[in-house]
UniProtKB/Swiss-Prot annotation:
Additional information: Is regarded as an important allergen.
Organism: Merluccius paradoxus (Deep-water Cape hake)
SMART domains (UniProt xref): EFh
Positions that bind Ca(2+) 1: 51, 53, 55, 57, 59, 62
GO molecular function: calcium ion binding
Protein name: Parvalbumin beta 2
Length: 108
């Protein structure tokens, strides 16, 4: 899903670092997976991969399954991790993360 954007080895390392429930940190994950240093275009491409229902927003249910977009065998985020992730990215308070909010979150 992220071919041409992210390296498989980086994805594997990023997932390994947050295997245990409660250890997910979006900033650390973005850095490990190599997203932080990507172009605005690649960051947008990643958004559209994560936006599974193609609504133009990443909603809470999509955030919960965020890690599984990178690898089908990955765990779901805990409710606390999901809510913290949403709160960090949802700057306009509409309950979802739009593409511009996503870009700002990745670069934060």
């Amino acid at each position: 899903a992220f071919s041409g954007i992210l390296a498989e080895a980086d994805i594997a390392a990023a997932l390994k670092a947050c295997e245990a429930a409660g250890t997910f940190n979006y900033k650390a994950f973005f850095a490990k997976v190599g997203l932080t240093g990507k172009s605005a275009d690649d960051i947008k491409k990643a958004f559209f991969v994560i936006d599974q229902d193609k609504s133009g927003f990443i909603e809470e249910d999509e955030l919960k399954l965020f890690l599984q977009v990178f690898s089908a065998g990955a765990r779901a985020l805990t409710d606390d991790e999901t809510k913290a992730f949403l709160k960090a990215g949802d700057s306009d308070g509409d309950g979802a993360i739009g593409v511009d909010e996503w870009a700002a979150l990745v670069k934060a």
